[in-house]
Amino acid sequence: MTFNKFLKYLISLFFLSILFHVITHKNNLVFTNYDNKKSCFFPFLCMFFTSHLKRYINRYEKATFFALKTSHTNNLRVTSLAGNSYPYYQDKKEKDFSLRSNPLKKHKRPHFLMWSLFFN
């Protein structure tokens, strides 16, 4: 199991443990008392935790991950953090933002050129 998958499982277990704790202690955490009537807070908690869990998983799939590197120098084992920046995008083909790709866009300013790449 890679470090990235381990981190995702750790985050999901963290959110599930919070949700389980809220469910088991529902007398004082799930139900809140407004104007002497009980209103259920549980659907909002489910929606909140699932949406945030999806958001964190999507963020950590594309974010910078650090791997532990071990190097042996002078018979000493040195462990250091090595960063791999944006592994999700490394396999993608790089876009050519030069004006040679479309000579008709030469008269436009650079930020207009950037917008025209997406809205053609």
From Swiss-Prot:
Domain of life: Bacteria
GO biological process: DNA replication
Keywords assigned: DNA replication, Plasmid
Free-text function comment from the UniProt entry: Putative control of replication message.
Further information: PC194 is a plasmid that specifies inducible chloramphenicol resistance.
Protein's recorded name: Protein cop
Organism: Staphylococcus aureus
Gene name for this UniProt entry: cop
